[in-house]
């Protein structure tokens, strides 16, 4: 899978950009605040239909302009495709796939598979459960597009139930029960997909981490669902029971306290919870193992390598971890941002396509 051409118009710091990346490593070099991350953000936008940095599409439009455009020509194992995203200030963005307007952003899922690794990805390990749920949701949406729609419907039903809980005077007979049944049916689909995902990921992560640490540490990744998937009543029955049991508490607090929106991933090193007790170095290594596992998982499920984005991340890793990362991306198209080529050359990345980013322009060397 690779992007053959990336076009930006009035997007962030770029009045116009027509980038023709190579199939291997594409190094985007420039000083801080020159727009390197803006270019890889556009790749992420084409994969997921949203930015990884902001939920406000208006921020993606170049300052002083009424609209913006992102277009990516790509090739995957189904053929050649064109993804276009048109932005207008004050309007919903429009997504086009092969020149046909998509009715929803979910139609993008799985068309352009992307794995992004940036310094903030340490939050997968060191922040709260919401970051780890986001990690699961992003990868499952790419490898199992039906999951994306189940999650969207679940979140919509959850929003409706929470709105009722905030205004108990509006609750009529059977109203909460209706939402409980919807949440339980959709929650069952989500929990089953997450179980399967973590089962596959944990095996890959264990082997990768063993390689990174020379066998000194064992990385254990476990799914920590809020609803027990092994309950004798099944996931659907267990969730109905949990929602009924927590109803008084939900009414008191004004939101739903049980369900997969409260799931987590357990991350342990040799039996020690790295989320709470790990050093910065251990958290960084665990995050790297998770990202490399994600890369391998998508490659296995989709039967082709995803596009890899490394946004100013090599400087965060020591030489050994850099080398492991380089080995893992041999068959990937990679967009790599950095302030200098020196570290890349030391890592043995002499054969790459280099683009210089400065003053709203990006030129090949």
Regions found by a protein language model. Name each.
Residues 123-124, 130-177, 181-184, 189:
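Long, charged N-terminal accessory/stalk domains
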Residues 1-31, 171-307, 316-320, 324-327, ...:
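Conserved NTPase motor "head" modules and their coupling/switch loops across ABC/AAA+ ATPases, GTPases
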Residues 311-313:
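Walker B catalytic acidic pair
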Residues 44:
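Helix-to-loop junction immediately C-terminal to a conserved catalytic motif
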Residues 36:
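Conserved lysine of the Walker
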Residues 72, 333-340:
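Structural recognition of the conserved hydrophobic beta-strand(s) that form the central parallel beta-sheet
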Residues 47-131, 137-143, 147, 202-207, ...:
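Nucleotide-state sensing region of NTPase/ATPase domains
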């Amino acid at each position: 899978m690779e992007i053959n051409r990336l076009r930006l118009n009035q997007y962030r710091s770029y009045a116009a950009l027509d980038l023709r990346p190579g199939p291997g490593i594409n190094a985007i070099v420039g000083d801080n605040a020159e727009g390197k991350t803006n270019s890889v953000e556009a790749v992420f936008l084409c994969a997921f239909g949203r930015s990884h940095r902001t939920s406000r599409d208006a921020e993606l439009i170049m300052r002083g302009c009424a609209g913006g455009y992102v277009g990516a020509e790509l090739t995957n194992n189904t053929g050649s495709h064109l993804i276009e995203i048109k932005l207008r200030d004050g309007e919903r963005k429009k997504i086009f796939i092969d020149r046909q307007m998509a009715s929803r952003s979910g139609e993008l899922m799985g068309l352009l598979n992307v794995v992004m690794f940036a310094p903030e990805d340490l939050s997968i390990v060191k922040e709260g459960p919401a970051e780890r749920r986001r990690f699961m949701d992003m990868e499952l949406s790419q490898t199992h597009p039906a999951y994306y729609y189940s999650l969207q419907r679940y979140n919509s039903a959850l929003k409706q139930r929470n709105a009722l809980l905030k205004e108990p005077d509006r609750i009529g007979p059977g109203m909460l029960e209706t939402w409980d049944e919807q949440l339980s049916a959709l929650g069952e689909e989500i929990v089953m997909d997450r179980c399967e995902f973590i089962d596959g990921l944990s095996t890959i992560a264990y082997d990768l981490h063993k390689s990174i640490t020379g066998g000194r540490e064992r990385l254990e990744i476990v799914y920590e669902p809020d609803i027990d998937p092994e309950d004798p009543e099944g996931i659907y029955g267990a969730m109905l029971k949990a929602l009924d049991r927590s109803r008084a508490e939900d009414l008191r607090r004004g939101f739903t306290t049980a369900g997969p929106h409260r799931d987590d991933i357990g991350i342990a090193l040799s039996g020690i919870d790295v989320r709470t007790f790990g050093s910065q170095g251990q958290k960084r290594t665990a995050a790297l193992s998770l990202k490399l596992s994600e890369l391998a998982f998508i490659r296995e499920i989709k039967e082709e390598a995803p596009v890899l984005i490394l946004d100013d991340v090599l400087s965060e890793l020591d030489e050994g971890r850099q080398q492991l990362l380089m080995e893992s991306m041999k068959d990937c198209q990679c967009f790599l941002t950095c302030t200098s080529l020196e570290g890349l050359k030391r890592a043995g990345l002499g054969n790459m396509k280099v683009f210089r980013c400065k003053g709203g322009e990006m030129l090949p060397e």
